[in-house]
Amino acid sequence: MDKIVLEGCRFYGYHGAFKEEQTLGQIFLVDLELSVDLQAASLSDQLTDTVHYGIVFDSVRQLVEGGKFILIERLAGAICEQLFNEFPPIEAIKVAIKKENPPIAGHYKAVGIELERQR
């Protein structure tokens, strides 16, 4: 299956189980892999034959920056739901969400989740 990839999208949001996360917010890193049939676009060179990743980015940004979720698992699920609703050609989605600085003790590069959904 063909894929459209958005990697390292950075957004500021207020998601998390801790009060500090909900009031102070933090940066969220989002990676997306969208399974789409790109056959027509690969032949036509027309934007109308693909999924516009700029619009995908804006859609995800609105959810991450405008919504509030306790769990990033739920945020990821909401991203999948929204993208499936907005873009019928998307057949499957893999989304990864990471927090670089959650309020937990320890040394790590990031913590996060990854989920995959199919239409």
Swiss-Prot record:
One Gene Ontology BP term is: folic acid biosynthetic process
Name the reaction it catalyses: 7,8-dihydroneopterin = 6-hydroxymethyl-7,8-dihydropterin + glycolaldehyde
- What does UniProt give as GO cellular component? cytoplasm
Name the UniProt key words of this record, in alphabetical order.
Folate biosynthesis, Lyase
PANTHER family to which the protein is assigned, alphabetical: DIHYDRONEOPTERIN ALDOLASE 1-RELATED
Please report which protein family the annotation says this sequence is part of: Belongs to the DHNA family.
The protein, known as: Dihydroneopterin aldolase
Give the source species. Answer: Streptococcus pyogenes serotype M3 (strain ATCC BAA-595 / MGAS315)
The gene for this chain is folB
